[in-house]
């Protein structure tokens, strides 16, 4: 929704909250439903109402539990039956520096200040552990914003008696906990408040009158920031950035001005701004964001511009370069198809408002930020939260290279008349075996990112995946596919729950970058083999339809399962007798965990 895109009108959002919600719920978007518990150290009602808008816009339909005013500690430590039965999917602890209970005094000794610090840390740590034990769900915790005033002036930052120093030390303790606990996430309230303007943010009037820990007008900025973490946890991040060239990655028009005439580099303020934006884009690539070009240009001119000696980006930084004179909405759609991702996974960055509007109206779900002035490009993409990082794996570092190799595979496929011959030519081998610790982060990440080849679309938090990993009641398989072009990484996951002599499939997913490679048959062969080893006689498969997973509606039929149930909502149940199964993979050589690093 345009009204909820950065930069938004906070006053408008607050005023039109009800009508915006009504419009979002009526837009026909398929959303995942999530329960969110908000434990507040201050008034949270308007925060929750505004957060709901941003989550609906991100494809999440939230149901909220709100603690009573300042009852965050009690709810965390001693939840009542209402909260226990609510069973949140995520807990957000909204505390601020207003909730620090014992500040340093100028007369305190170092030991006394350290004791106060540890008391605060222990209070929060006890809450976090209690929530983890009782609810087994992700926790989002604000860090602390800096104080509105500094009693010691600049000395407040480094003197242990200063509140600024005390809050900084508390924040460092929070960060240390986050580094050691995978399902624990810090919401950077300190940054958001500073970005907004601490003087306005911390206006005492709103605390004294309404017990708000921020000014009323800051609530949309705060809720927007929180929504980024929630949508990232639940797999709603964007995956690719499609960029225009002229006046987006450099100043000027390369076809008219020539390579020597475009503005990029260190010579002028404008050229520096474009260089900084290119540098930022290259940093996004290092996070696993797929970079593509979508520009109305001659291909040769585009390549020449990207090879400018003062630029930070080069042609090989991009997986796909569409520099032609086709409509950009068509190029975006083709880019999505070639990457095997949905169009709503793409962010399109273009300085031209007319081109932006065409893509915005023609490509449903694609993010199209208003790129207003090169000096604002980085801020616009950064603050929009398209690529909020909550997990990071080795595969993220290699993602652009993996997609490039897929392009090489596609080119080779075109030279074969028989598809099976093409598959054999890839010289594929796979590691398919029980989960091992080194891949748990990637496996968890896949469950929250894979939407198309995913029969149940069940999501797992790191804590939930750890529980599955340790439970002998499951059969677990991950699949890692390698071919002559390179390593695709972990691309498939199957989780089945043993139920007597039956196995119920809780999860079956595969990355779209290895579609049509017969990897699913290799996974099935290994699953049946494992079932035979442990005495499982039947495998029950389940398909739950979503707006994005139609491609696997007939997966179990293709596997040779028999349909046993079909419901009005389109969900189906399937069954396979293990004794009747014959192997179906004939093109991938399969190994176990002893070849995991192959």
Language model segments and positions:
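Short hydrophobic/aromatic-enriched beta-strand-loop microsegments
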Residues: 61-64, 315-319, 366-373
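Basic, amphipathic juxtamembrane/active-site segments
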Residues: 254-279, 364-371
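Conserved Lys-Pro-Asp/Glu-containing loop-to-beta segment of HAD-superfamily phosphomonoesterases
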Residues: 332-353, 359
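Acyl-donor binding region in acyl/amide transferases
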Residues: 484, 490-567
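Extracellular glycan-modifying ectodomains
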Residues: 1-242, 249-250, 255-261, 354, ...
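Substrate-recognition element of Asp-dependent hydrolases with the DxDx(T/V) motif
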Residues: 276-307, 321-322, 359, 439, ...
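Terminal substrate-recognition subdomain of acyl/acetyltransferases
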Residues: 360, 364-426, 529-598
